[in-house]
Design a protein with these regions (language model features):
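Non-catalytic cap/lid and distal C-terminal segments of serine-dependent acyl enzymes
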Residues: 1-178
Length: 178
């Protein structure tokens, strides 16, 4: 949580202390529903992690070709997401089928597929765009306006928690027939 604390306790306050060229102070909303966070590659997993750990600070996430298989603990997110009560987050994932691959870590694209599957299973409002490119920003740049429209749809309505399939009762029904 050091990264998100740095953002909230140091970076944003420092930015708010600055003035625009015409002398006005910057004013950032403290309402998490008014905030989004985005990143690409390792920044994509950082953006997701910041919102995951602090949904009281960020509610909208754009992860472009997020390195969920390469960063420590990132490969654990799909299982953690499935086992944790849903949080009020809206998440957009982007990646390309030709993203990076490493014999020790696996395929970055597969990591994003697992994230999308876990988020959908757990009731999150999640969308994705899978392109054919590699570990670069070409596809992400092309879809960025649509991503922003999707992340901010319905604003100022609050982003809400979804209902996880864990909570749908299927497991209880399944156990009752055993």
């Amino acid at each position: 949580d050091r990264f998100v604390r740095f953002l909230l306790e140091e970076l944003l306050p420092d930015a708010e202390a600055k003035k625009t060229t015409d002398g006005r102070l910057l004013n950032f909303s403290k309402n998490p529903n008014d905030r989004a966070i985005a990143g690409a590659s390792s920044g994509g997993i950082c953006a997701f992690t910041a919102a995951w750990e602090r949904p009281d600070a960020f509610r909208r996430v754009f992860s472009a070709f997020g390195s969920f298989v390469a960063m420590r603990g990132g490969n654990e997110y799909p299982a953690l997401i499935r086992k944790t009560e849903a949080k009020p987050l809206r998440i957009f994932l982007e990646d390309g089928t030709e993203d990076a691959w490493n014999p020790l870590l696996g395929h970055w694209f597969d990591g994003n597929l697992l994230m999308e599957s876990a988020l959908a299973f757990s009731g999150y409002e999640v969308a994705h765009s899978w392109g054919h490119g590699g570990h670069d920003g070409v596809h992400a740049e092309n879809i960025f306006p649509d991503v922003m429209r999707w992340l901010w749809k319905g604003w100022p309505k609050e982003v809400e928690c979804g209902v996880s399939r864990n909570e749908s009762g299927w497991y209880t029904e399944f156990r009752s027939i055993l």
